[in-house]
């Protein structure tokens, strides 16, 4: 306190807010001047140094090195020591005992999530958390997951642009995985207005995938909006892929030696007759009819 200019005059006021766990609070002077910061170390108390919202106190005003005024030498009216047995008892029951009460209303006996007062609260309502009501109906006392009201026009859940409704049917109160209308494709349902991207690629209906489709029909009666991406590469049909195709096309790649099919160039008995010249000769001995790895010549 040596660096602070302390006034000899003392003032009176009431505690506006105090948090024992943080060790500071605010006092509102009786003369109507600006509220003053008070630190726990400035409290003169018999026992626990704490203040209770609504406590009448007497104090001196100082100006610290930071240029801000604050209350020091805080006592009971008349200059006596404050009597605080512990941090959860006191004269008032609003922010009882400096921070142990409800952060919403300041009362003891419950915490803010169980508070029945939405956004109200004792002398420190500017610090109250408020706005913690149900996101579905806007009421306090419960969360959206426990809300029994769903879908009314005046409810908060109905003002979110419909983002909380079921993605299949568009109704609220359930999610798509619990929807019983998975196979209905009416125009007023959300699942049917997605540009058809969620339907079966074989028949175009919604509610199942192409692999589960029972309408394995020929081309022309099926959806082909994918530019042929759903057709079989083997036979050109739709409804299956090449590995499941029952029609196996002859391989287009034949023998590189003679141009025939049914064998590879290394097994071709017409080596040398394909116009390859010396390209088909052994690199070791220069003779045709075999490769270097099969050559028996040691020269």
From Swiss-Prot:
Its main location: nucleus. SMART domains: CSP, ZnF_C2HC. GO terms for biological process: cold acclimation; response to cold; response to salt stress; response to water deprivation. SUPFAM superfamilies: Nucleic acid-binding proteins (SSF50249), Retrovirus zinc finger-like domains (SSF57756). Keywords: Acetylation, Chaperone, Cytoplasm, DNA-binding, Metal-binding, Nucleus, Repeat, RNA-binding, Zinc, Zinc-finger. CDD domains: CSP_CDS. This is Cold shock protein 1. It comes from Arabidopsis thaliana (Mouse-ear cress). The lineage of its organism: Eukaryota, Viridiplantae, Streptophyta, Embryophyta, Tracheophyta.
């Amino acid at each position: 306190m040596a660096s602070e200019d302390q006034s000899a005059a003392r003032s009176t006021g009431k505690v506006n807010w105090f948090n024992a766990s943080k060790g500071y609070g605010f006092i509102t002077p009786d003369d109507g001047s600006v509220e003053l910061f008070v630190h726990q170390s400035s409290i003169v108390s018999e026992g626990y140094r704490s203040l209770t919202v609504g406590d009448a106190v007497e104090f001196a005003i100082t100006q610290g090195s930071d240029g801000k005024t604050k209350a020091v030498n805080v006592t009971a009216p008349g200059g006596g020591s404050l009597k605080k047995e512990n941090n959860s008892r006191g004269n008032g029951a609003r922010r009882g005992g400096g921070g142990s009460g409800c952060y919403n209303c300041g009362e003891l006996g419950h915490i803010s999530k169980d508070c029945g007062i939405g956004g109200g609260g004792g002398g420190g309502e500017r610090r109250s958390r408020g706005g913690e009501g149900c996101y579905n109906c806007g009421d306090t006392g419960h969360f959206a997951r426990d809300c029994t009201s769903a879908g009314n026009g005046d409810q908060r859940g109905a003002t979110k642009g419909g983002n909380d409704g079921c993605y299949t049917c568009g109704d609220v109160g359930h999610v798509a995985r619990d929807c019983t209308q998975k196979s209905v494709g009416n125009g007023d349902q959300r699942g049917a207005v997605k540009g058809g991207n969620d339907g079966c690629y074989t028949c175009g209906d919604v509610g199942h995938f192409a692999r589960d489709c029972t309408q394995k029909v020929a081309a022309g009666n099926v959806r082909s909006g994918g530019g042929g991406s759903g057709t079989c590469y083997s036979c050109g049909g739709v409804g299956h892929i090449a590995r499941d195709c029952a029609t196996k096309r002859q391989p287009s790649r034949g023998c590189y030696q003679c141009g025939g099919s049914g064998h590879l160039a290394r097994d071709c008995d017409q080596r040398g007759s394909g116009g390859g010249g010396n390209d088909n000769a052994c690199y070791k001995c220069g003779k045709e009819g075999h490769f270097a790895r099969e050559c028996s010549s040691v020269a």
